[in-house]
Amino acid sequence: MDVHKEVNFVAYLLIVLGLLVLVSAMDVDAKACIRECGNLGFGICPRSEGSPENPICTNCCAGYKGCNYYSANGAFICEGQSDPKKPKACPLNCDPHIAYSKCPRSEGKSLIYPTGCTTCCTGYKGCYYFGKNGKFVCEGESDEPKANMYPAM
């Protein structure tokens, strides 16, 4: 009878330890954001754009800081000089040497309008959010979900 109790205790202990290991291995975002709607006017998320076959129309002055701009043959032209938080007054001409850009964030929309219930807390990192008056409010604080996080079944 004592052996049976010891086996049950060891089995129970192994199950509890297994659950603890499983829970600690989970990637849980503990950030709790409040649901507050309608305070942001729009968001800008600098994204990679264009290709050698489908060039973009921009110049180094108007290109976003943090994004690199390349020619059709892949030669580096410049890093963008315009900060989305404080845009520079730049000429609107297209630099014929620039074909495409590579930005740290490359998926999703560049312009988010309307923002719905997005807040600074729920907004994506690397995206800049502005009030309805066009003034910079904040940079997003949440990680952007992966493209195929929940594949269709």
UniProtKB/Swiss-Prot annotation:
Keywords assigned by UniProt, alphabetized: Disulfide bond, Protease inhibitor, Repeat, Serine protease inhibitor, Signal
Name of one Pfam family that matches: Prot_inhib_II
Keyword ATP-binding: no
Sequence repeat residues: 30-86, 87-146
Cystine pairs: C33-C121, C37-C117, C45-C127, C57-C94, C60-C78, C61-C90, C67-C103, C120-C138
Signal peptide bounds: 1-25
Residues marked Reactive bond for chymotrypsin (site): L92, N93
Main function: Inhibitor of trypsin and chymotrypsin.
Family: Belongs to the protease inhibitor I20 (potato type II proteinase inhibitor) family.
Name under which the protein is recorded: Proteinase inhibitor type-2 K
Source organism (scientific name): Solanum tuberosum
Lineage: Eukaryota, Viridiplantae, Streptophyta, Embryophyta, Tracheophyta
